[in-house]
Amino acid sequence: MNWPALKERINLYEKLMRLDKPIGILLLLWPTLWALWLSALGRPNWIVVWIFILGTVLMRSAGCVINDYADRDFDKHVERTKERPLTAGKVTTKEALALFAGLSLLSFLLVVFLGNTLVIWLSLPAVFLAASYPFTKRFFAIPQAYLGVAFGFGIPMAYAAHLGEVPAEAWWLLLANVFWAVAYDTEYAMVDRDDDLKIGIKTSAITFGRFDVAAVMLCYGVTLAIIGGIGYSLNRGPAFYAGLAVATCIMGVHYTWIRGRERMPCFKAFLHNNWVGLSIFVGIVVDFLVSGRNLW
């Protein structure tokens, strides 16, 4: 294979892994970083941090590949997805499965490098969740909740990496992530609702129906309440809650965008959730930095 052909192949694989659309990586990364900082009380092991960041990129990429494999017959009927490499026939199903297996193997090797038995065991359901999520859209009324577990499974793994155990706090944080994922992915599903109804797949936007906007805002509220409760249980300071306050304001802006149920504003709100995750993370980091200097 000559260089131009190889370059074109690499570009197709990059698109299949959605490396050109990093929002999914960020939505997966922020909860993992929350957990790494909270579990280490603001002093995470930097080797662990970098391994989790790289693992997040690899597993999100693997998730995109298997998602396109599962949805290849549906995507051709959706305007936004009909040109994806697998659906368009530019990448074969064998190539996609091989790429998914390779990315999953690399992620597992990263976990093995940590040398933590509990993290290794937790990586097994993490891979299962990533691989099985795309198929839940065929029978589960709110597959976004399943996505929240899959996207958030780095949380218990992060606690296990730092503490050697997974305390209740980690599971509460995972639950918060489930509600956050239902919120932002419902916004995403609102974009494709008409197409999804035609092809017969299930989404939260369809299930919630005319209560979709209210459901999004309720899920946002539960997310903030759970994270706030975690902060209270850990005796966190003003900066922690300031991060939540900023996130609350951002969520309020999202309401103004999604209440009209128009495609582009809903998609804009989905993308904007990056700033929700970042705001919460900055609040956590700053709070630990300030409390470490006894400034509160």
UniProtKB/Swiss-Prot annotation:
Single GO MF descriptor: 4-hydroxybenzoate polyprenyltransferase activity
Stated family: Belongs to the UbiA prenyltransferase family.
Native source species: Dechloromonas aromatica (strain RCB)
Protein's recorded name: 4-hydroxybenzoate octaprenyltransferase
Covalent S-S links between cysteines: none
Location, primary (coarse class): membrane
Keyword Transmembrane: yes
Function: Catalyzes the prenylation of para-hydroxybenzoate (PHB) with an all-trans polyprenyl group. Mediates the second step in the final reaction sequence of ubiquinone-8 (UQ-8) biosynthesis, which is the condensation of the polyisoprenoid side chain with PHB, generating the first membrane-bound Q intermediate 3-octaprenyl-4-hydroxybenzoate.
